[in-house]
Amino acid sequence: MPELPEVENVRRTLENLVTGKTIEDVIVTYPKIVKRPDDAEIFKEMLKGEKIENIKRRGKFLLLYVTNYVIVSHLRMEGKFLLHQEDEPIDKHTHVRFLFTDGTELHYKDVRKFGTMHLFKKGEEMNQMPLADLGPEPFDAEMTPQYLQERLQKTNRKIKVVLLDQRLLVGLGNIYVDEVLFRSQIHPEREASSLTVEEIERIYEATVTTLGEAVKRGGSTIRTYINSQGQIGSFQELLNVYGKKGEPCVTCGTILEKTVVGGRGTHYCPICQPRI
């Protein structure tokens, strides 16, 4: 699933491609992707004649701002936005097409069909689901070691499970939580309430630096991720633990292990990340 670095790179490339374009028509071939309104035909009619003004990101969500509305899109596992010419062949996994007045088309492709789209009037999007209960962005002023400390010390849940909770902090998924905990030298099954102030500060620093580096490297292409210009990321070349079960730790040489935490495959070093 695309996490913050991947979604941010989709946002940047997509914004460069479609800002200023006017929607002439919308074709939805898999209506279940459209969650709001509950009728894809209404979704289509509301967007006709709308001009794309800018594209923002909230956590793992893309927000496409048009003249009067906001399209809130979650890519889930395999979702992709790609720009095409009107005479190009249509991929069988293309489920939504935004046809522009200049003859180009924005295609939403999704092999797994897990992605979602919600349409809101401008100004309503942040106060309604799926955005209403999201925590702060990792790079926001609100996100500080003190913010994390206040919340982590109130829960006995395992730290990996807590960091995956988008109500605490947005943007982290399975890949980057494993990397953050390795850099922090924290075992993924530690209870959050057991962490010291110094350990929480390490988590904070690792979160900000890991995500920042990943954004600069275009994200991580583990399987099929590409941005809206069709480019892969390169941060996968810098991953220390994710997907590396059985390989030696880059720090101590110990063989990396994999377990399941909160139903998610989890990679770690048993020496660098001791379970105290």
Swiss-Prot record:
Keywords: DNA damage, DNA repair, DNA-binding, Glycosidase, Hydrolase, Lyase, Metal-binding, Multifunctional enzyme, Zinc, Zinc-finger. DNA binds at H93, R112. SUPFAM superfamilies: Glucocorticoid receptor-like (DNA-binding domain) (SSF57716), N-terminal domain of MutM-like DNA repair proteins (SSF81624), S13-like H2TH domain (SSF46946). InterPro entries: DNA_glyclase/AP_lyase_DNA-bd, DNA_glyclase_Znf_dom_DNA_BS, Formamido-pyr_DNA_Glyclase, FPG_cat, MutM-like_N-ter, Ribosomal_uS13-like_H2TH, Znf_DNA_glyclase/AP_lyase, Znf_FPG/IleRS. A zinc finger (FPG-type) spans 240-274. It catalyses: Hydrolysis of DNA containing ring-opened 7-methylguanine residues, releasing 2,6-diamino-4-hydroxy-5-(N-methyl)formamidopyrimidine; 2'-deoxyribonucleotide-(2'-deoxyribose 5'-phosphate)-2'-deoxyribonucleotide-DNA = a 3'-end 2'-deoxyribonucleotide-(2,3-dehydro-2,3-deoxyribose 5'-phosphate)-DNA + a 5'-end 5'-phospho-2'-deoxyribonucleoside-DNA + H(+). Transmembrane segments: none annotated. Binds 1 zinc ion per subunit. GO terms for biological process: base-excision repair. It comes from the Bacteria. Its cofactor is Zn(2+). GO terms for molecular function: 8-oxo-7,8-dihydroguanine DNA N-glycosylase activity; class I DNA-(apurinic or apyrimidinic site) endonuclease activity; damaged DNA binding; DNA-(apurinic or apyrimidinic site) endonuclease activity; zinc ion binding. Its EC number is 3.2.2.23, 4.2.99.18. Belongs to the FPG family. Monomer. HAMAP family: Fapy_DNA_glycosyl. Involved in base excision repair of DNA damaged by oxidation or by mutagenic agents. Acts as a DNA glycosylase that recognizes and removes damaged bases. Has a preference for oxidized purines, such as 7,8-dihydro-8-oxoguanine (8-oxoG). Has AP (apurinic/apyrimidinic) lyase activity and introduces nicks in the DNA strand. Cleaves the DNA backbone by beta-delta elimination to generate a single-strand break at the site of the removed base with both 3'- and 5'-phosphates. PANTHER family: FORMAMIDOPYRIMIDINE-DNA GLYCOSYLASE (PTHR22993:SF9). NCBIfam families: fpg, PRK01103.1. This is Formamidopyrimidine-DNA glycosylase. It comes from Bacillus cereus (strain ATCC 14579 / DSM 31 / CCUG 7414 / JCM 2152 / NBRC 15305 / NCIMB 9373 / NCTC 2599 / NRRL B-3711).
